[in-house]
Amino acid sequence: MRVAVVSEFYPRAHDPVLGVWAHRQAMAARDAGADVRVVVLYRPIPPRATRPRDAPRALRTLAAQPRHATLDGIDIEYVPFLAPPRPLSYGTWGAWAAPTLALALRRGGFDLVHAHNAVPAADAVLRARIRAPLVVSVHGGDVYYTATRHASGRRAVHRAFGAARLVLANSAGIEAAARDLGATRTRVVRLGTDLPEHPVAQSRVPTLVTVGHLVARKRHADVLRALWVLRDRHPDVRYRIIGDGPERGPLEDLAAELGLGDRLELCGQLPLHDALARARQGHVFVMPSVDEAFGVAYVEAMAAGMPAVGAAGEPGPAEIIGAGEGMVLVPPADVEALAARLDQLLGDADLRRRLGDKARETVRRAFTWEACGRATVTAYEDALR
């Protein structure tokens, strides 16, 4: 079975962790028997938020992206396209990307196209008139943002979901949202992680860890405020954040305002291997984010025997906690409840160990890349019937 994977989010020369989950799923599908090639849609124009003095360097970096690469044995073609800037035009990006995508796929040689997200990838596939069965994976952006913020985006999402032979969601909550937007044939295919072969040595200092882009919805600020509530009960606890983004400055300012500047460790964006190594040295993984479709970072931490804390009512944490133990939930945006749960976990090493053991077992049973690969290939086979 020959599969063309089309994605906007995929590792690039200047950003090797962007969409790494899409690459790992492609690897998992290949290892489960599919013949996979990847086409990446990328817009070689700096984001509108780029500072003017940084724009020339950003433009050179984007322009230097090779058109072809091989990563972990998978052939990748990077297809540039021009489009107006986000956010209002995002729903139309499929139309802008379609001509160059059509050229990239004109040779054919595949039985099925797997598009990550309805917009722009699946919409571009449809507009390029690619004559192959279409599978669409929805990871949250289509249902949380694209379909709710622009009429053009909503139309594109409806069109893609309606045309797909199968829509794959990363959690049951996202599957339900996709069906509300016109998807008829759906199933949940969970993403995964690797289980460490050996125990990971923890930091000597009690450490909370979050891995995620520094954006407001990840609620890093809530963790800082909870740490302030616990400042006297747990004076040695540190908070390590792995990731980067627009909230870095505000988080540094908040930490200074709360008197926690010496407790906050901002690691920036790290290569995946280094990010996992640093994250798994922690004692508790905490990410009380909202609009969380899945959250691979939770299961990556749990695989190493770390208990995880997430927000109640979110599709991703609900999917994980529904599969087994090792994760606890708190009401979203409730700093006092978050502080109470962290106080419990930080103050009881036996509880952390028990929850950590259960977390690792939950991942072993339900969230490995091997399981994801098998489920993905089964979905491909069903879409071809």
Residue ranges with predicted function:
Residues 1-64, 70:
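N-terminal subdomain of nucleotide-sugar transferases
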Residues 161, 269-270, 277-282:
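Short alpha-helical donor nucleotide-sugar binding micro-motif in glycosyltransferases
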Residues 168, 200-227, 240:
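Conserved donor-binding/catalytic core segment of Leloir-type glycosyltransferases
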Residues 173, 192:
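Carbohydrate-associated surface elements
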Residues 252-270:
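Nucleotide-activated donor-binding/catalytic signature segment of Leloir-type glycosyltransferases, i.e.
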Residues 290:
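Aromatic "clamp/platform" in nucleotide-sugar-dependent glycosyltransferases that forms part
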Residues 307-311:
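Short hydrophobic beta-strand element within catalytic cores of glycosyltransferases
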Residues 322-323, 327-336, 344-349:
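Conserved acidic donor-binding segment of nucleotide-sugar-dependent glycosyltransferases
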